[in-house]
C-alpha cells in the first residue's frame, strides 16, 4: 500500500494565528484587523506552485494587508506558523514502513517554509520514503495532476493508496481519482484509523 500524508495539521501542528500575532507585534496593527484582511488568495497559490519568488509573495501579501514590514520581518512571522510535531503520527509512519508499505508526504508548501521545517523537524524526513512539495512540482492540491504525479512516480494505483489531509477540498480532489481519502479533523483521526490495522 501507498500511504500519503499531508504535512500541516497532519504531521505537524500549524496555526496561522501565530503568524498574524507576530506581524501584529511588529506593526502594532490589531490582530483582529489582520485576521480580517488575511486570506489565501492567488499570490498564495502561485507561491505554493513555485511560480513567484518569496520576495514577490511577501510584497504581494504586505500590499494586500497594508503591512509595513521588511522582508526579514515578514519571514520571521511566516515561520511562526509551526507549533509542534505530532510524534504519534511519526511513529505510525515508521511502523508502516517496517511492514513494507510505502510512506510519502505530499504538502502544499513554499520555499519560505522549507528553509525552516526540514531542519526544525528532521524526524519527518526520517519517517518518509519521499517528500513531494507543491513548490517543486509546479502544482498544488487539490489539482488532480498532483495526485496523478505521485501515483505515477510511486507506481501505485488509486485503489492501493490511502491519503490523509486536513483540508476538505484536498480530500475531495483525491476522492475523485478513486484514492481512499481520510479527512484529519484532530490528533485522534490517524491513530484511530490505524488502531486495528497496526495492532
Swiss-Prot record:
It comes from the Bacteria. Its cofactor is Mg(2+); Mn(2+); Co(2+); Zn(2+). Keywords: Hydrolase, Magnesium, Manganese, Metal-binding. Is proposed to be a useful catalyst for hydrolytic transformation (e.g. removal) of alpha-Glc-1-P from complex substrate solutions containing multiple sugar phosphates. GO terms for molecular function: glucose-1-phosphatase activity; magnesium ion binding; manganese ion binding. Mg(2+) binds at residues 6, 166. Optimum temperature is 40 degrees Celsius. Magnesium. Can also use other divalent metal cations such as manganese, cobalt or zinc. Optimum pH is 5.0-7.0. InterPro entries: HAD-like_sf (IPR036412), HAD-SF_hydro_IA (IPR006439), HAD_sf (IPR023214), PGP-like_dom2 (IPR023198). Disulfide bonds: none annotated. Its EC number is 3.1.3.10. NCBIfam families: HAD-SF-IA-v3, PRK09456.1. Belongs to the HAD-like hydrolase superfamily. YihX family. PANTHER family: ALPHA-D-GLUCOSE 1-PHOSPHATE PHOSPHATASE, FLAVIN MONONUCLEOTIDE HYDROLASE 1, CHLOROPLATIC. This is Alpha-D-glucose 1-phosphate phosphatase YihX.
